[in-house]
């Protein structure tokens, strides 16, 4: 029996050393140290031994089991260490290699234009205000000098939700709400970017939803010259330092006097081309002095305070600035179109 145990020990240790994987080592462990292994079978025959030989054989069997287990543990440790080294070698990163470029998207052209206009006016002391897109009839019309049954309401068809609420047709309500917060004390210098909604049929130049930026400046002794100077700054910033503007008389219920503002054509320099329709001028926005009724309804004394206001369509400015011929391009999510503004 002693020789058999020694033979099994030698045989098991040799198989452990020859194993090339953790699985093979485990197979050896099960084969020799398991309940059905040969060492267990040898131990079952100890009952045939004398009382004197039995303790010696038991101690020898335990010694053999411990040596085989130690060989298995050592082999497992070596194999695990080799596996770690192999994985580290496979996953080694050369830190001297240049990094992979990150795939970035592009800012939307409307976002670019809005941020450019916001930055300009913030540098001039204006703040940016926002308001609800679902507006009351009062703020969208009445507070802007368009009482019920006023004929000027026909100028823009609206999306009504109830009799007294609608999707705002302009960002002008933000101006009134802001003036009310000031409780009749100036100055008020704000711009109001946001979405507006009108019942237009979508085509190359019209959309039922579009972006608008309106501006308001209310203080003592504000005049048309202040308005003109502000708009000249906007035109030069957006379309180039060589640009000039001209004011044409117009009508808006919430301003008096009211003007349409044209900028000298940035394509032909005012000589006449297809962009300016041979006139040398391009219309960019509407403006005027805030109507006294609007000031009074917002809580300002129109005899002490004056103001000017202006409004521009962001899509129109972007179309002119980037030479885009169809407003629908802004809303189709076409990557080919949007990727052109990656460097903007």
Curated annotation (Swiss-Prot):
> Per UniProt, what is the name of the gene that codes for the protein in this document?
pheS
Cofactor(s) this protein cannot do without? Mg(2+)
List, in alphabetical order, the GO biological process terms annotated in this UniProt record: phenylalanyl-tRNA aminoacylation
Protein name, UniProt field: Phenylalanine--tRNA ligase alpha subunit
* Molecular-function GO term, any one: transferase activity
Q: What is the lineage of its organism?
A: Bacteria, Bacillati, Bacillota, Bacilli, Bacillales
Name the catalysed reactions: tRNA(Phe) + L-phenylalanine + ATP = L-phenylalanyl-tRNA(Phe) + AMP + diphosphate + H(+)
Binding note for cofactor: Binds 2 magnesium ions per tetramer.
* Entry-linked Gene3D superfamilies: Bira Bifunctional Protein, Domain 2
Query: Which key words are in the record?
Result: Aminoacyl-tRNA synthetase, ATP-binding, Cytoplasm, Ligase, Magnesium, Metal-binding, Nucleotide-binding, Protein biosynthesis
PROSITE patterns, A to Z: AA_TRNA_LIGASE_II
Task: State the organism named in the record.
Answer: Bacillus licheniformis (strain ATCC 14580 / DSM 13 / JCM 2505 / CCUG 7422 / NBRC 12200 / NCIMB 9375 / NCTC 10341 / NRRL NRS-1264 / Gibson 46)
**Binding partners and assembly:** Tetramer of two alpha and two beta subunits.
Q: What would be one Gene Ontology cellular-component term for the protein?
A: cytoplasm
Q: Where does Mg(2+) bind?
A: 256
What's its EC?
6.1.1.20
User: Cellular location of this protein?
Assistant: Cytoplasm
Instruction: Cite the HAMAP family for this sequence.
Output: Phe_tRNA_synth_alpha1
Similarity remark: Belongs to the class-II aminoacyl-tRNA synthetase family. Phe-tRNA synthetase alpha subunit type 1 subfamily.
Its primary localisation, in coarse terms, equals cytoplasm
Q: Which Pfam families match?
A: Phe_tRNA-synt_N, tRNA-synt_2d
